[in-house]
Amino acid sequence: MTQSQVTPNAREALTETIVDAKVRKNLTFEAINEGTGLSLAYTTAALLGQHALPEKAAKLVAERLGLDDDAVRLLQTIPVRGSIPGGVPTDPTVYRFYEMVQVYGSTLKALVHEKFGDGIISAINFKLDIQKVPDPEGGERAVITLNGKYLPTKPF
């Protein structure tokens, strides 16, 4: 039976254990995810406390990380989502995403509504991908794809 968390505490503690094991074993999220049948972004989000993993994937990642049966069980629970506490994020990487939404949020909203009509882009029926590509001017660029299902507002 699927179980749900009612506070973020247990999953936050598990996330600390997972990150510690990842560092101790010198693993990448990609290596941990291998063989799960899930996307790298989904598994990483689950390991960071934002999604539940199917039983097979939970057992596989737990084995790679050296986690116990309690961790396997907890990885399968539906978490209390949201990893950024109230207020403006202070982590520089997370803040840049916050800044992007501050600058481009109204533009994204206007263009989504213009192209699709009144509605939202789902973060539930959603895929995320990040690619590292060369920058023609030198260095590297991040290409981040947010792929969510459009859900129209339905008058009632």
UniProtKB/Swiss-Prot annotation:
What Gene3D superfamilies does this protein map onto? Cyanate lyase, C-terminal domain, lambda repressor-like DNA-binding domains
In the UniProt record, does the keyword Nucleotide-binding occur? no
CDD domains for this protein: Cyanase_C (cd00559)
Q: What is its EC number?
A: 4.2.1.104
Q: Annotated Gene Ontology MF terms?
A: cyanate hydratase activity; DNA binding
Which residues participate directly in catalysis? R96, E99, S122
- Domain of life where this protein originates: Bacteria
Catalysis: reaction(s): cyanate + hydrogencarbonate + 3 H(+) = NH4(+) + 2 CO2
| SMART domains for this protein | Cyanate_lyase (SM01116)
Q: Say yes or no: keyword rRNA-binding present.
A: no
Query: Which of UniProt's keywords are assigned here?
Result: Lyase
Q: One GO biological process from the UniProt record?
A: cyanate metabolic process
The cross-references to Pfam families, in alphabetical order and at most eight, read:
Cyanate_lyase, CYNS_N
**Its biological purpose:** Catalyzes the reaction of cyanate with bicarbonate to produce ammonia and carbon dioxide.
Task: Give the family this protein belongs to, as stated in its UniProt record.
Answer: Belongs to the cyanase family.
Name of this protein:
Cyanate hydratase
